[in-house]
């Protein structure tokens, strides 16, 4: 088994030549393009997908390799996951050759070998550069081609930085050097993810409202902090993809995701000091200014400013860049229970909302939109330790108020305001529910 660690970028098609020139200037070993054909397999009921596995056969120059990838952690396009590779003599699956730990129950499921069929394919030219960064050996791969499923296809124009040996931090360090020029967009959608989407009919991708952040039982405050930033980054990248594809409303969701990053930093700001995220917040300000200038989606998304901001957030998460700024007292707080933290802050946010909206505001509601949105974001981040339906029902009235204010529906404003301020808490408060 290998532990695959790689960082993915989407390359703007018009920037390929400039990128290739830039890569040739690096000190390293260049490999001319070779053609890679890949067939991905799945069952009719998506057994592999449901068990977070990806199965393919890759062919290059008459040689074949069977690969099983198992879901790991993806943060902003940095993939860290187990990967099993088996050399085979011909392009036919030999599932019995995988080690037993590949399978969820420790053994190849009965009948699975007969049920897996080709689902989609990728065909691309891969050009490589092998470079040293810090104490690490890194492969840079430029992939140009297409992913195809039935009548649907989509271009592949990607750059991957894969750690061959060394440390993930060096991959991020190398990436920082590459994103100084325009044309790169950190992407979390793998070739396989795009292939599955095509195979399922290539339905239009829809806006994805931020949902209540789910956390594991007994999570620490630090785990909650990480989860909040990962959620914000995921929303940012998802809606960037939609924005560049021309989906209406996607730009607003990108800006909302960036605001969620800020709200996360503020929510945990009593523990993680502002100086820990000062550089990140400065970069966010630059990107927000760029997007406010009404540039095109391509200009904004593939800009060095945007790429640097997302990469900095990714690095902040992967390296837990806040830890060096914590004193002993803060370390104790961040190791404490996230649920206890959530109880305290849910009560504070509810009290703030009741203070603001406890009485009619006439024509002054618009002045409170930013505060209302910030409080809703915080409650979305804090509510995951509780019963989902109860938390959603409580939030819906505040979200309804937000929408009514935005759309200036005066009757609806008062309806949702009255409903929202009269709700009972769904969390522990003052020692009771």
PLM-predicted stretches and their roles:
Residues 1-433:
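Function-determining surface determinants
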């Amino acid at each position: 088994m290998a532990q695959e660690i790689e960082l993915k970028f989407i390359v703007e098609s018009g920037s390929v030549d400039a990128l290739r020139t830039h890569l040739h200037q690096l000190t390293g070993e260049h490999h001319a393009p070779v053609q890679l054909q890949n067939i991905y397999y799945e069952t009719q009921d998506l057994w592999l997908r449901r068990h977070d596995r990806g199965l393919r056969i890759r062919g290059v120059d008459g040689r074949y390799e069977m690969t099983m990838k198992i879901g790991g952690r993806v943060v902003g396009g940095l993939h860290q996951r187990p990967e099993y590779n088996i050399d085979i003599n011909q392009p036919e699956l030999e599932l019995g050759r995988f080690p037993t730990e590949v399978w969820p129950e420790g053994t190849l499921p009965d009948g699975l070998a007969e049920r897996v069929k080709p689902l989609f394919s990728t065909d691309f030219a891969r050009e490589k550069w092998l470079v040293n960064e810090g104490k690490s050996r890194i492969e840079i791969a430029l992939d140009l081609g297409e992913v195809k499923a039935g009548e649907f296809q989509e271009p592949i124009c990607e750059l991957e930085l894969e750690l061959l040996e060394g440390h993930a931090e060096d991959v991020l360090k190398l990436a920082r050097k590459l994103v100084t020029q325009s044309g790169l967009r950190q992407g979390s959608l793998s070739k396989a993810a795009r292939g599955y989407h095509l195979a399922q009919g290539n339905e239009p991708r829809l806006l994805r409202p931020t949902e209540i952040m789910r956390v594991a039982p007994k999570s620490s405050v630090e785990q909650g902090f990480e989860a909040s930033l990962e959620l914000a980054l995921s929303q940012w990248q998802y809606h960037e993809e939609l924005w560049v594809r021309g989906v209406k409303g996607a730009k607003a969701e990108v800006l909302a995701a960036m605001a969620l990053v800020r709200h996360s930093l503020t929510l945990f700001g009593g523990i993680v000091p502002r100086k820990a995220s000062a550089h990140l917040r400065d970069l966010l300000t630059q990107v927000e200014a760029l997007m406010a200038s009404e540039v095109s989606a391509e200009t904004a998304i593939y800009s060095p400013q945007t790429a640097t901001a997302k990469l900095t957030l990714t690095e902040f998460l992967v390296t837990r860049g806040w830890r060096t700024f914590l004193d002993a007292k803060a370390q104790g707080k961040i190791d404490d229970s996230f649920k206890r933290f959530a109880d305290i802050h849910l009560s504070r946010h509810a009290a703030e909302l009741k203070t603001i909206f406890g009485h009619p505001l006439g024509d002054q509601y618009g002045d409170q939109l930013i505060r209302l949105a910030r409080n809703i974001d915080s409650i979305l981040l804090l509510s995951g330790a509780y019963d989902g339906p109860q938390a959603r029902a409580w939030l819906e009235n505040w979200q309804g108020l937000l929408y009514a204010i935005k759309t200036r529906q005066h009757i609806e404003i008062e309806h949702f305001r009255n409903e929202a301020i009269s709700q009972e808490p769904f969390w522990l408060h003052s020692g009771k529910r």
